Amino acid sequence: ASEDFGAVTKILIQKISKFNLNQKIKIRLITNGSYISNPNIQKALTSIKKFDSEVWFKIDQVRSKEVKAINQINISITSLKKNLEASLSKCPTIIQTCLFRINKKLPEQAALDAYINFLKPYEKKIKGIHLYSLARPSEQPSKDRLTRLTQSEIEDIAVKIQALNIPINIYS
């Protein structure tokens, strides 16, 4: 997280106000959420809330083993919940999820069930879910094991996630 996030947000708000762009520009924070519960980040999010703003909160997996393998971070389910709740408390939040094959295998049903169960308590607060697959070759150490899903495979997964009653957009 940038220590300058609050200052940058303040400048952004000043410029939007100065040029009367309040109804013309959407402020969008795209984040993995790892620092979103930080008081300085929370204060900055509060300041942009009055503008047309939203957070795109990246959640590819919710089980610790998969999160570590895919995103190379150690995060507990408790921390992930805390960070999502911090985002939801400040701005409309869209979940952004990348889906792909690992070792030529589709995402496991158990992983999808964990994802759905994780988001279920927040379904009335989450503005939407964006599903997509790899757009270009991965730069991660496991890149040789990752492959893109087809449009129909993403659509099949979206049908399962629709149990959440959250609007879903598919990008492929």
Q: Residue spans of the language-model regions?
A:
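Conserved AdoMet/S-adenosylmethionine-binding subsite of the radical SAM
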Residues: 2-145
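Aromatic-rich peripheral "rim/lid" segments of glycoside hydrolase catalytic domains that contact
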Residues: 143-169
